[in-house]
Curated annotation (Swiss-Prot):
Chain ranges passing through the membrane: none
Pfam families: Toxin_cobra-type (PF21947)
GO CC field: extracellular region
Subcellular location: Secreted
Domain of life assignment: Eukaryota
Protein name as annotated: Alpha-elapitoxin-Dpp2c
Tagged with keyword Secreted: yes
Amino acid sequence: RTCNKTPSDQSKICPPGENICYTKTWCDAWCSQRGKIVELGCAATCPKVKAGVEIKCCSTDNCNKFKFGKPR
């Protein structure tokens, strides 16, 4: 499996057994100025997250694309 990974936002080969791609987003103190923090990566299962953290998981190559842009 290949997934996009931060910080480079480039497609990388996942380690053996990690067949899920994920996109995790959350806000910190700078969210209103910089936007949400984004983490892209691979996992064996869809990661569990705490309240306030959004996660999207998928299982095809490079399915976790995220459009990075300038905050408004």
